[in-house]
Every structure is written in structure tokens, then in C-alpha cells.
């Protein structure tokens, strides 16, 4: 986005990974949050359809602000239980919590490095925002640091990849140690159109 095309609309597919909340003692911070990050088959929840929509506006000096909404279905919840049947070597187990519906609403401020690296195609970015998640019967706020990469096919059409670490304000555990309000990664891939 830029002053010539300050508005952008994006849409595509999102994936939710709750593995980051299944941390256990004895692991360093990096392993607690990033081990199995790309275990798509076992840990990622993906709806096979358009599942996020965003709108944003350029405000100057590489910064833009935006709102987005997403929907998903959580049929893979990861938690730490080394005594449960089927756990992996680290004691993690994946269960279906009951096909919980996931709805997310997020506000984000993003900084694009495109002008800094003097590119017209490659557009890396960092973002920070806040949001609210509705997960089954629970709802909770999140703080969302993130990173993204957009590849612009033309001046106005691009392919966008992004990830956010949605830090929960309410990691409440039930009697089985399963987190009701999990922090999680949300990854997205889709098309972005900018206009003015």
C-alpha cells in the first residue's frame, strides 16, 4: 500500500495452531512455543474455503492500519499429557475438542519494509495488534505480534502470507489441564488488492 493506492482488501484461507499453549516444564521458551510449528497434518486447523477477510488503509511512512475477521473449526487441540494414550515422544497429545467454532476479530498496525529495501515486488512486514476470539462457549482478548510477506504480481494485485502469535489474556485450564482460552498461531494465505 502507498499514497497512490491507500486502501487494500485481502481474503484467503487461515490456519489455527494451538500447539503453542501445550508447553511443559523443562523446555526452553523457544521450544515451548515453536517446536512442531510446521506440523500441518497434526496441529493445524484449516477450513477448506475462504475463511478470512481484511481491509486496511495506508497512513504514511510505511505504516497501515486495518481490521480483519476470520472463521475456523477447531478439531485439533494439542495439550501436554504424557500419561495419555497416543502421546508423542514429548508427551503432547492431539484431541478433537468437539469441532469448536472459532471466530476472530482483529485490529492491526503494520509496517512495510518494501520502500526501505527499494523493491516493487517483495513486501516484507511486521505487525502488532489486538483482537478478540470466540472459541466454542469461551471468548477472550489477544495481543497479536506478527510478520508477513506479500509478493506483488502487479501494482495492485498481490499474494499475501502472514502469521500472528495471538497471546491470550485468559489461559484458564480445566481439571484435565486443557487450556480453555489458548494462545495460538494463526497463519493466513490469500490475495490482496490495493486501490485508491
Regions found by a protein language model. Give the residues of each.
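Short glycine/proline- and aromatic-enriched beta-strand/turn motifs that initiate or cap beta-hairpins
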Residues: 1-56
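Predominantly the C-terminal beta-signal and adjacent terminal strand-loop region
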Residues: 2, 20-24, 30, 34, ...
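Residues that define the transmembrane beta-barrel architecture of outer-membrane proteins
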Residues: 5, 46-51, 99-105, 122, ...
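Transmembrane beta-barrel strands of outer-membrane/channel proteins
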Residues: 11-15, 67-71, 126-132, 147-149, ...
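Outer-membrane beta-barrel proteins
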Residues: 42-43, 135-137, 176-180
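Membrane-embedded beta-strands of outer-membrane beta-barrel proteins
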Residues: 53, 107-109, 126, 145-147, ...
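Gram-negative (and chloroplast) outer-membrane scaffold detector with strong preference
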Residues: 56-143, 193
Amino acid at each position: 500500500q502507498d499514497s497512490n493506492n491507500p486502501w487494500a482488501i485481502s481474503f484467503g484461507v487461515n490456519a489455527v495452531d494451538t500447539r503453542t499453549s501445550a508447553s511443559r516444564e523443562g523446555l526452553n521458551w523457544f521450544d515451548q512455543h515453536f517446536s512442531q510449528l510446521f506440523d500441518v497434518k497434526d496441529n493445524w486447523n484449516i477450513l477448506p474455503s475462504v475463511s478470512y477477510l481484511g481491509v486496511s488503509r495506508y497512513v504514511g511512512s510505511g505504516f497501515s492500519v486495518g481490521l480483519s475477521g476470520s472463521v475456523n473449526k477447531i478439531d485439533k487441540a494439542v495439550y501436554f499429557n504424557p500419561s495419555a494414550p497416543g502421546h508423542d515422544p514429548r508427551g503432547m497429545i492431539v484431541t478433537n475438542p468437539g469441532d469448536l467454532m472459532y471466530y476472530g476479530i482483529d485490529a492491526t498496525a503494520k509496517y512495510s519494509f518494501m520502500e526501505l529495501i527499494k523493491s516493487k515486488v517483495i513486501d516484507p512486514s511486521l505487525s502488532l495488534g489486538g483482537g478478540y476470539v470466540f472459541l466454542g462457549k469461551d471468548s477472550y482478548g489477544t495481543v497479536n505480534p506478527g510478520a508477513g510477506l506479500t509478493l506483488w504480481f502487479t501494482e495492485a494485485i498481490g499474494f499475501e502470507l502472514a502469521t500472528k502469535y495471538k497471546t491470550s489474556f485468559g489461559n484458564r485450564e480445566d481439571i484435565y489441564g486443557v487450556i480453555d482460552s489458548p494462545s495460538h498461531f494463526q497463519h493466513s494465505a490469500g490475495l490482496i488488492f490495493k486501490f485508491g
